[in-house]
Amino acid sequence: MPVITLHYEDLEKLTGTDKETIIKRVPMIGADIERVEDEYVDIEFFPDRPDLYSVEGAARAMRGFLDLETGLPEYAIKPYEVSISVSENILKIRPFLGCAVVRGVKFTSSSIKSLMDLQEDLHWGLGRNRKKVSIGVHDLKNVQPPFRYMAVDPSFEFVPLDYTEKMSMTDILEKHPKGTRFAHLVKDFEKYPIILDANDNVLSFPPIINGTLTTVTEQTTDLFIDVTGLGEAVYIALNIVVTALAERGGQIEFVRVIRPGGEELVLPDLEPKERLLTTGEVKALMGMDLTVEEIVKQLERMRFGAAALDKEAVEVKVPAYRADILHNYDLVEDIAKGYGYENIKVKVPETYTPGKSHPISLMRASVNEIMVGLGYYEVMPFTLTSEKINFENMCRPKTDDVTYVLHPISEDQTMIRTTVLPNLLEILSLNQHRELPQKIFEFGEVVSNETTGQHVAAVSIHPQANFTEVYEVVDALMREMMLPYEVKESEDPAFLEGRRADVYVNGKKLGVFGEFHPEVISNFALGYAVVGFELDLNDLIGKKI
């Protein structure tokens, strides 16, 4: 989770209250205080609240929580003067683009650092390390609209940020620190994304690096913000950045985005989303009979718009910068925060029910201990994935046991995974800049036919990775769990023929292991041999290991 440094001078100015009050109350909105110093406090905000990743966002939330300024924040937006056109050739590379202009911002060295920190934290929290979302912030005075978002040949040259000499885009990926770190996001395309102004000056090579021409300094007052990516999380990131700048006194201005075929978007879209919440839903989760008036009060403290429709229903307006409100449960959670968990009365259970570790937890602890002892690092990726990752990249046929997300917010999260291995290979693809060998595992959930299962999977990548290595790991795991097993020839297309095997226990197939097929390795843009295994442990849960 991101740790945000909040300077007291900024906090007190933006909240209108003293640092002692802030330090005492800020954990109640969903944060842990990591460090308290004379000039600043380091706070770890929960990853579901990227709108709090800046001093401006945290101050906005605290003003409501402290009853200094409640209700839905409103931001005036001026008509557009700037436009940007999107070329057809960029749509298969990085198709989503969100833009805005913010004028009249007064910067100091600390506020510039705060903005850059917000940018990088959003890259992590919303952007999956820039894969889904990358943000560019530019000094507008040095470039001339209209802008163009397009794909160009890798030989195209410009001066990247913090450099003084021109470099080709190929050289940037090979030599620039940011280029080598994020090259895997674009290197497999024939052309690379770029944003140019009317005079062919470079604003950005997303998601890699900005041009040096638009560097933000303390003299900067007017900003152009671009957010590119693979899904609608782009627009949420844009809203978070522009509203943070508006909290510091900036004036937001629309930008016209002209897409291929003449479709036009006018961004940012800060219209709140509306939801209907009932007193029954609140009682079901909080166990309290709150009136609609009390519900409205607490929602407004948490910076929602809220109005009672009758004695049982409330219309809620969700700010456009809130990425975490996916269900009414999320609204009730915020009501509980506003009401104060400390004010919710404790009810002692009528019966004595001592707890104990769940069988799944016992199994997980045992397997984790074994895998760590074998030299593997535990990872915990998301369980949401896509058909492309789950099936296509693994060279496996699509199956009918998939549970789909009804309203996915991105093309990367359209279904619940049916297997763990694709997630592990994704993690390897995001860590190619790190030293080899890399050995990772997960004991995690999969869903098949709407039934949750528990799988353990592991992968290892290095030049000498082979069938014998993964066989030894599977054998060690099975022996430590005291499970007699046998192996048979496998036909799993994700693995190389002749170097793959299925694992059976008591005549039932438990999983598969082997060397991954070169096509699978290529699909995940990996450059070395990879081996792995996955075992379904569901039938073993609760049995003595």
UniProtKB/Swiss-Prot annotation:
Top EC class, one word: ligase
Keywords of the record: Aminoacyl-tRNA synthetase, ATP-binding, Cytoplasm, Ligase, Magnesium, Metal-binding, Nucleotide-binding, Protein biosynthesis
Catalytic activity line of the entry: tRNA(Phe) + L-phenylalanine + ATP = L-phenylalanyl-tRNA(Phe) + AMP + diphosphate + H(+)
InterPro entries documented for this protein: aa-tRNA-synth_II/BPL/LPL (IPR045864), B3/B4_tRNA-bd (IPR005146), DNA-bd_dom_put_sf (IPR009061), Phe-tRNA-ligase_IIc_bsu (IPR045060), Phe-tRNA-synth_IIc_bsu_arc_euk (IPR004531), Phe-tRNA_synthase-like_B3/B4 (IPR020825), Phe_tRNA_ligase_beta2_arc (IPR022918), PheRS_beta_core (IPR041616)
One CC-aspect GO term: phenylalanine-tRNA ligase complex
SMART domains documented for this protein: B3_4, B5
Keyword set includes Metal-binding: yes
Domain of life per record: Archaea
Membership in a protein family: Belongs to the phenylalanyl-tRNA synthetase beta subunit family. Type 2 subfamily.
Record-given protein name: Phenylalanine--tRNA ligase beta subunit
Lineage per the UniProt record: Archaea, Methanobacteriati, Methanobacteriota, Stenosarchaea group, Methanomicrobia
